[in-house]
Amino acid sequence: MGYCSGRCTLIFICGMQLVCVLERQIFDFLGYQWAPILANFVHIIIVILGLFGTIQYRPRYITGYAVWLVLWVTWNVFVICFYLEAGDLSKETDLILTFNISMHRSWWMENGPGCTVTSVTPAPDWAPEDHRYITVSGCFLEYQYIEVAHSSLQIVLALAGFIYACYVVKCITEEEDSFDFIGGFDSYGYQGPQKTSHLQLQPMYMQIPLDNN
């Protein structure tokens, strides 16, 4: 009963991870955040494999899913540190999330709740010609906190998924071991006698009484 509930819970967690990461992937595409797009894509593939392993009782798939969750948590911790500008990181000057190929920022920077975007003209000399220079004001919630909330939710789901993945793998392994033990005992206790393929033929003699009359 506990194993069934744990397996069902892991399936639910995988489903929630897929929904949340797909929502995040859409907004990362809108903001041209190439590093998160790549990480999200890999995460989607691994979660699908973990979901398949949970449904089909494949412990190797679930183990790979659990290992990936450790890396996924590490990535989301880095994203949180980036947007909160921990250490030497700066969300305004560093272009890590776009692989340094564009100056795009998070989609939520201009489209957050209550944000008002104002174009600045003329643009500074250092601004690229294909980019507009803007100011954003009036946001109810700054974009970096929205990104931090997204990453925090992913961390919570990943930790829950890791715990239940380990539990399900443990239950599947114990169940397989018990089946192997029962099968080995039955085959040993109830194995029929072996038939030899070579039979030695012996001549048979019959004594027939003779009538002297």
UniProtKB/Swiss-Prot annotation:
Per its UniProt record, what Pfam families does this chain match? NKAIN (PF05640)
InterPro entries xrefs? Na/K-Atpase_Interacting
The answer, when asked if Transferase is one of the entry's keywords, is no
Major localization listed first in the record, in broad terms: membrane
Any one of the GO CC terms: plasma membrane
What is a biological process (GO) this protein takes part in? regulation of sodium ion transport
Presence of the UniProt keyword NAD in the record: no
Provide the protein's localization.
Cell membrane
What membrane topology is given? Multi-pass membrane protein
Task: Could you list this entry's UniProt keywords, alphabetically sorted.
Answer: Cell membrane, Membrane, Transmembrane, Transmembrane helix
Sequence intervals crossing the membrane = 5-27, 35-55, 62-82, 153-173
What quaternary arrangement does the UniProt entry report?
Interacts with ATP1B1.
Q: Which family does it belong to?
A: Belongs to the NKAIN family.
Protein name (record): Sodium/potassium-transporting ATPase subunit beta-1-interacting protein 2
Species this chain originates from:
Bos taurus
